[in-house]
Amino acid sequence: MSSIGRFTRFFRIALLLIFVLSVLGTHLEGHAILKSSSPASGGSVIRPDVPVKLIFNVRVDAARSKLQLLMPDAATVELPIVKWSSPDTLVSKLTGLKPGAYAIRWQVLAPDGHISRGEIPFTVRNR
């Protein structure tokens, strides 16, 4: 095989590799995945006031994101999202909670345009 033929073959393989990596990289990088939360999933907290903090692997659009509190009686309450300095974090505050099983339902919009959702169950207890 001539050196021009080898170069052409190498060039085609390199272009294909660059294309595949760029497509996969964009796809994998953009989805919002919850890295950590407070309260923690399955954890318990002491009432009545509970700070809420959700940290994601990518920045999220806070203006188009939602937080809801699922109450022990199955009622749902919208939670306000407080402005925060970190673009990968959503913050809110729960007040006046009584002992029982709750969950925070979240929905976020990632930079790639995909919506991610999840729930964080937790228990509120007295001291």
Give residue spans per PLM region.
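Proline/serine/threonine-rich low-complexity linkers at boundaries of modular beta-sandwich domains
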Residues: 24-35
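Surface-exposed loops/turns
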Residues: 41, 47-48, 98-99
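Bacterial N-terminal signal peptides
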Residues: 13-23
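Bacterial N-terminal signal peptides that target proteins for export
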Residues: 3-15
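A glycine-anchored, Pro-Gly-centered beta-turn/N-cap motif
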Residues: 93, 98-104
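Extended, polar beta-sheet/loop recognition surfaces of beta-rich domains
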Residues: 37, 45-47, 51-58, 113-127
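Short, surface-exposed alpha-helix to beta-strand junction/turn motifs within ectodomains of secreted
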Residues: 52-80
